[in-house]
Amino acid sequence: MRRVKRVIVLILIVMLCMPLLPGVQTEAADGGKHLDVLFTHDTHSHLNSYSTIVNGKQKEVGGFARIKTLIDEKKKENPDTLILDGGDFSMGTLIQTVYTTEAAELRMLGYLGCDVTTFGNHEFDYRSSGLADMLKTAKNSGETVPKLVVCNVDWDAMEKEGLSKGQKQIESAFETYGVKDYVVIQKGGVKIAVLGVFGKDALECAPTCELEFKDPVESAKNTVEEIKKKEDVDMIACVSHSGTWEDEKVSEDETLA
């Protein structure tokens, strides 16, 4: 995405207002329920570690094995830790060359124990057919893969205009994989609804994306209201692939929060 950008997981809790960190502990006001939340984002096909210079010294950095080690350490403390991802899990190394045929990135998120992820702009780099093939490959692998959520795809507008071939491919793949506006997950004694949002900046940075999207903030509000009406949950979380800027007035994730 453009400029310096970070994708954040927005934790929306009625009883609690707190800044979000890479590792978050949430607790109800009465102290009755506790939840640990970990999240990743923009892993960009970096399944393997690589050698680079850090503070003048050559070091081996990155890689899913290191992330897995950290997650496993946290899960030893709390097996019911919620693990979320903010999208852009693909495109960035040679691993992307098997994006459509192996779905290596999404399957590896499953290996990490990721519960829920969403789409980033780079998931659309191989066009509609590439994303559709990747989703079907991941589903057909038979492995445990993360749930995928995005609440602001404007299917009504696209269907009114008549779905293109690419849009039909993605619609079919969404159905096969089970992509939803939101999902409900139980972690120990805590029930969490997780929704996904694809931001305006993400769309501007995805020229090969054929989908149309509704306003992310309004869609998130509407989905939260739907969750409150239909689901009995302790907490609502949103994984958003948007942008943050110094000016809070135009910073998408901060506006969404």
Where are these regions (language model features)?
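Bacterial N-terminal signal peptides that target proteins for export
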Residues: M1-I11
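Acidic, metal/ion-coordinating pockets
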Residues: A29-A257
